[in-house]
Amino acid sequence: MHGDLFGPVMPVTPGGRLFFLLLVDDATRFMWVSLLTTKLATTDAIKRIQAEAEKTCGRKLRVLRIDNDWEFTATEFTDYCANDGITRHYSAPYSPQQNGIVERRNQTVVGMARALLKQRGMPAKFRGEAVVTAVHLLNRSPTKSL
């Protein structure tokens, strides 16, 4: 699984969300997204997404490819991964191309969210909700992996 935290996204959503966490399954390219108010909520969001992903896929999360941002190197997160048997693969600093799968999906999701808002004439404060909608739509679209 590949993960990345995107943000801060301005303007803030009506729910006070500034960031979104995107996790992408390596085999199927299925995505899970969580809107977050702070970076401190990253570990809890990953726990929720992991439970949902394991229930959906019927397999345990074993490897997580992420960047070197502090939210992924914090003690709480490293302890959680160690206790749950998750191996973390970090990309080199300032090398987003090493985590290209999730970085590219971020671009696709943000672009689609922007297009959804523009097409309906909605204000930018609904970008978070548009991101969730974009992930929902992309998960139901065919990919090369399928």
What is the predicted function of each stretch?
Residues 1-146:
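Anionic group-binding determinants
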